[in-house]
């Protein structure tokens, strides 16, 4: 499965807690949202064609912040790529969370520069909603 089966319940819990959710993708975000089954949970979906730039440029992250109506410093950007998601979000003034995969997940090795490294979405929920 592209998205871990706990991702949707976790996003529901985040929405129930009053958090906004957005998709920022270098690919058509509607397609990702529809494939993953999370489009209905998103407040904003932005792709590179709308932002005019690819991650890790700060421009797409700035557009995400503006469309969500939330200051960059108040956003936790969740991704799966150190280079594109973590570094891009950090440069834009956001906090970053990155899912651990492969040997990082197996051995609990933190993602460099990420404010939060997590093994699964339930763990992310526990950290964010504690």
Where does each model-flagged region fall?
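Metal-dependent phosphoesterase signature
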Residues: 1-5
């Amino acid at each position: 499965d592209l998205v871990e089966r706990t991702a949707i319940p976790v996003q529901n819990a985040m929405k129930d807690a009053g958090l906004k959710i957005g998709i920022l993708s270098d690919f058509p975000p509607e397609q990702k949202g529809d494939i993953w089954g999370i489009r209905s949970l998103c407040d904003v979906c932005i792709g590179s064609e709308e932002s005019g730039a690819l991650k890790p440029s700060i421009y797409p992250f700035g557009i995400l912040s503006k469309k969500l109506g939330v200051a960059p410093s108040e956003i936790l950007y969740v991704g799966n790529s150190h280079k594109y998601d973590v570094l891009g979000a950090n440069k834009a003034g956001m906090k970053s969370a990155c899912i651990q995969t492969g040997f990082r997940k197996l051995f609990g090795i933190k993602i460099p520069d990420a404010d939060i490294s997590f093994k699964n979405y339930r763990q992310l929920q526990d950290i964010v909603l504690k």
